[in-house]
Amino acid sequence: VKLELIRNFCIIAHIDHGKSTLADRMLEITGTVAKRDLQDQLLDGMDLERERGITIKSHPVRMHYDPGDGNTYELNLIDTPGHVDFSYEVSRSLCACEGAVLLIDATQGVQAQTVANINLAIAQNLKIIPVINKIDLPAANLELCFEQMEEVLAIPREEALKVSGKTGEGVAELLNEIIRRIPPPEESSEKGTAALIFDSQYDTFRGVVNFVRVRRGTFRRGTKIRLFSNGITSEIKEVGFFNPRMLPCDELRAGSVGYLIPNLKSPADTRIGDTVTDSDDPAASPLPGFREVRPMVFSGIYPIDTDEYDQLKASMGKLQLNDAAFVYQAESSAALGFGFRCGFLGLLHMEIVQERLRREYNMDILATYPSVIYHVYLKSGELLNVDNPVYLPDPSAIDRIEEPFIKSHIMTPTTYIGDVMNLVMSKRGVCTETASADAGHVIITAELPMHEILIDFHDKLKSMTRGYGSMDYEPAGYRAGKMVKLDILVNGEPVDAFSSIVHADFAYERGRQIAERLKEAIPPQMFQIAIQAAVGGKVIARETIRQLRKNVLAKCYGGDITRKRKLLEKQKEGKKRMKLIGQVNIPQEAFVAVLKAQEFNQ
C-alpha cells in the first residue's frame, strides 16, 4: 500500500458517547469482520470491558475501504477509553495517529472529557473531525450540540458530521470524510528504521507482543532489532496487523500500525513509549515518546494466602506490561505479611487492576485503604514523600504536612449548580470560577484535595446531577493541611494495616466507623477486648467487645450473697490475669471487612 493511501485515526469522546458502537459499524461497513462474527463492542476483548460496557484498553484494527474513486485505502483505527483514569491510554493512541474523530452524544452535548480529550489531540497537532452521534434517538438535541461546539470547543458547526453508530446512518459518509480530511502519514527524510511502541501485552506462549507505529523503514520476520531504552537486541519472530485479531503478514512498512513479536520472554525487558530500531540500519536518536505518567493513588495489595506471594509478583509483572500506568514495589506489613505497594491513576483504575488480577491471574488478594503521596517536612528541614501511613515519622519531629491538590473542571446543568458547590465545599474544596457553556450548562472550576475525591466524589456528583454532571481533573501542586495519622489499637496494640492519614476534622468520624466495623468482625474472646482509634497518643473513639464468661453461680441454690460474691471475684481475677497474657488474633475476615469498606462516608 502506498503511503498516500494510508489513514491513521482514533475515536475520542466522553464516557458512553458511543465510540465502540461506531467502531463496530465501521468494521461492518468496510467488511473487515464477517457478518456472522459481528457482535456489540467487538473490539472490547476483555470480559470486564463487556460486563461494565466500558473500554479500558485502546484497541487497534486495520480496515480496507474503497470510497468509489478506484483506490482501496488502508484505514488504521484505534478505539480509545473515555474515563479520566485512562486518559494516558488516549494520549498514547494519539501518538500513533494523524487524525481524530471527536464524538459528541446528541442527547448529552459536550461534556468534561470531551474537552480534555480534544485538548490532548490539539497538543499532538492532529486533524479533528467533529461528529455528532446518536441522531436516531428521539431525545437528540442537535442545536444544543452545535451551540456547545462553537462556545466551548471553538469548532464551527459547518465542520460537524451527523451519524448514528447504532443504525449505521452517515457512517459511510464519515469514512469518506476521514479519507478526505485526515492527511496520510508523512515520509521522513531522516535515516534509520524506527518504530514507536504504543502498547504491549504478554502472551504465555510467545512472550512479549509489542504494538507499534512504524515511522521509518520496514520491519519483517528475522529483522535484528534493538530497543533504545535498555539496548537489548533480539530477532523478530513475527510481524502482523489487527483484524481485529492478530493476523501475521510479510512486513510492516513506514506509516502503518501493527504488532511485532521480538524474542523476549521477560515482561521487564520492554517499555511502552520505547523506540525499536533495526540493528543493521539503526536510527540515530529515539522517537519522541510519551511523558512519564505519575500514579496518583496508592494502595497495598497482599495475597490472602501468603504462599502465593511469588505467583502474585509474576502476575503483576505481566499486567504491568499491558498497563503502563500501573506501578508496584514490594513491601511488608506486620499484620498482612508480604505484599506490594501499588500506584494507580485513579480509583476506577485501581478497581480494574484488582479485578484483572482476580480474573485473569486467579489471585486471591486483599487491598488496603487507598492513599495519596504526602510531602512531610521535618523540623530538621528534610523532606519525605510518604504514601504509606506506617512510614509517617513521630508527630513531634514534623514541621508540616502538605497534601496534593487537583484542579477540577465540573460540567453540570445550571439547575444543580448549588448542590455541586455544596459538594465541593463539603470535600474541603474551593470553587474558583464558573463559566457558562450554553444557556443550560455551566463549567465550574474548583480546587480540591486529591484525597477527598478518592472514595465517593464522582458517585455523589453523578447522583446529585441525575447523571448529567461530568468532571475531569489535573494535578495542581501541594498545599499544607491539618493532616494527622489515625492509629487503630486492638487490646492496646496498634495494627499497621488499619492506619491511615486523614484530615484532623474527619479523624473522629473515620476512627469511629473502623472501630464499629471491627467490633462486628472480631469474634469475642475469654477476656474483654478494647478497640481504640487514636491520634498521636490521644484516644478519640472506643468500642468494647464483651468477654465470654461461664456462669459460675449455676451451682449456688439460695445461700448467702457472700458465697456468690466470692465466686464472682475469683472469676474476675482470672479474667484480669488472662487479659495480661492474652493475645488477640485478628481473623483475615476482619481485615477484609474493614479494607473492603469503601463506603467511608467522609
Language-model segments: residues:
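Structural and coupling elements of P-loop NTPases
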Residues: 1-602
